[in-house]
């Protein structure tokens, strides 16, 4: 449980394991339930198109997401699981506060994340920006 009292639903952990071990999912988007007491799965997808994933992040509200990021730098195809904390500048203040104070609870539940990204704008989660972050040494 987080400082905010928010819990992580068991389906979040199941979805993470499905993405990490099953390799059937490409990404999962998480949100707060309506009462802001639990983090739940909003969407699971097998779509490999990064722009489709970005389209599932709302322009005006917060979300968390995990993405199995695939890239090739000439050494063969590699994958890294990234955790994204999405908090757009135009999101409601209360939403930003709850998501911010609950992020670590969800993040700690996931072992095997390669890169964490905190984003307030789509430019911070653009493919090239993410590629740069996951390939930093």
From Swiss-Prot:
Name this polypeptide is given: Cofilin
Keyword Cell cycle: yes
Any one GO cellular component localisation term in the record: nuclear matrix
Family stated for the protein in its record: Belongs to the actin-binding proteins ADF family.
Annotated compartments: Cytoplasm; Cytoplasm, Cytoskeleton; Nucleus matrix
Keywords: Actin-binding, Cell cycle, Cell division, Cytoplasm, Cytoskeleton, Nucleus
Entry keyword Cytoplasm: yes
GO biological process, one term: actin filament depolymerization
Range of residues in the leader sequence: none
InterPro entries linked: ADF-H, ADF-H/Gelsolin-like_dom_sf, ADF/Cofilin
Molecular function via GO: actin filament binding; actin filament debranching activity; actin filament severing activity; actin monomer binding
Lineage of the species this protein comes from: Eukaryota, Fungi, Dikarya, Ascomycota, Taphrinomycotina
